[in-house]
Amino acid sequence: MATHFNISGELTQELLAAGSNVSVNKISLTNTQKVSKCKVDLYIEKKLTGKFYLLKGVELPIGATLVYDDINFSNAANEFGLYIKLTDGATFTMTGSIDVTGTNTNVPGTNTLYTSELSVGDEIVVSGETRTISSITGNTTAVVSAAWGSDLANDTSPDCNPTALVDVIIN
């Protein structure tokens, strides 16, 4: 039976704990980020033995799937756990402009392409303030997770720091 994970961000995450007794034959990794590639480290680790990399710094293009098969490691008690670490994509300048009016969580865009350029979890930088996208409702309407500090100047070149998004399937 396959196990599925949606992984985001740059923190190391445990996919399988040592002692899970999961038989691993194949691991599929898909970059689901809309606008940037990401790097993947996939490794097994055992206490007092160390880390053994299956993939190290492998770049996953947008929408690409990498299938790692012919894999065999022990996931029994006191054996190996399976871990993943992602590296986010490069910062880019968004299309259009953003004019924040007041201390609220709205992200009003003009000629922006939120639905194709942003994903929930991405950070945007508007007039020097950085916020995390919590929802996207259209090309010119989005919401951030924390209120803006003030009525900001119209930013004609807002930046996006995309968060790595990878789907993992373990068979």
What are these regions, as identified by a protein language model?
Residues 1-22, 26, 30-35, 39, ...:
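C-terminal interaction-tip segments
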Residues 2, 48-56, 92-94, 129-132:
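Surface-exposed loop/edge segments in extracytoplasmic proteins
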Residues 7-11, 61-68, 101-107, 155:
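Solvent-exposed, conformationally flexible loop/turn segments
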Residues 14-21, 71-75, 114:
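Extracellular and analogous surface-interaction loops
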Residues 20, 64-67, 75-82, 90, ...:
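Surface-exposed loop/turn positions
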Residues 34-53:
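Short, surface-exposed beta-strand/strand-loop-strand elements in extracellular ectodomains
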Residues 47-86:
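Intrinsically disordered, low-complexity Pro/Gly/Ser/Thr-rich segments with frequent PxxP/GP/PP motifs
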Residues 90-162:
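Autoprocessing Asn-cyclization modules and mimics
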